[in-house]
Amino acid sequence: MATNAKPIYQRILLKLSGEALQGAEGFGIDASVLDRMAQEVKELVELGIQVGVVIGGGNLFRGTGLAKAGMNRVVGDHMGMLATVMNGLAMRDALHRAYVNARLMSAIPLNGVCDNYSWAEAISLLRNNRVVIFAAGTGNPFFTTDSAACLRGIEIEAEAVLKATKVDGIFSADPVKHPDATLYDQLSYQDVLEKELKVMDLAAFTLARDHNLPIRVFNMNKPGALRRVVMGDKEGTLITK
């Protein structure tokens, strides 16, 4: 039951984890999951919401894992950035097949594959109701795609970062290990730090906090959850000042 007739956001940054794209496969990209996500993004565009997207790469590659095995962390992170580009290409294709205009921008130059990231161009595209997918993280090693999501969210002046996860929001403890854990409806940045809740890495989180960028954590696997978030319904956990 919608509480608002109109969306509460005009421009958002949607953060999708790479794992979200793998579905039940455990690796790679599940085409049915990809198409469902494209349809959910299409709904937002049809509501008049301007959508930026940052996708992780964990379904294809994780730099930190190989760094522990001895690989140079910078090399591993560069490989991780390329994984996000592969996911971005898949998402752009899924959006195009759903008749949604989308542009893929990479923080590292990949001529002939996708556009280079340009802040001015991204803003112009968003204003023209194009979905803009930001790939390759921040373009720098040692920074997560959550950091990229907050950075791009601030740059494009998004009203919130919507972090799509596999759980219903932020809990007082791991809901898998502790079934009686409490789901938080709303938290302040300070609450998250004091309770040491795992929302995103500290660099990403403090960036959002310092720029008063609200973060909404919700379950992307719940049908219609994304729409409910943008319509202002009770869904997931909101973090603000």
Curated annotation (Swiss-Prot):
Instruction: Enumerate the SUPFAM superfamilies for this protein.
Output: Carbamate kinase-like
The regulatory note on its activity is: Allosterically activated by GTP. Inhibited by UTP.
Got a GO cellular component term for this one?
cytosol
E.C. number, please?
A: 2.7.4.22
CDD domains attached here?
AAK_UMPK-PyrH-Ec (cd04254)
**Where does the chain bind ATP?**
15-18, 58, 62, 165, 171, 174
Broad EC category: transferase
Classification via NCBIfam families? pyrH_bact (TIGR02075)
**Subunit structure, briefly?**
Homohexamer.
Q: What does this protein do?
A: Catalyzes the reversible phosphorylation of UMP to UDP.
Q: What is this protein called?
A: Uridylate kinase
Organism per entry: Sodalis glossinidius (strain morsitans)
What is this protein's gene name?
Answer: pyrH
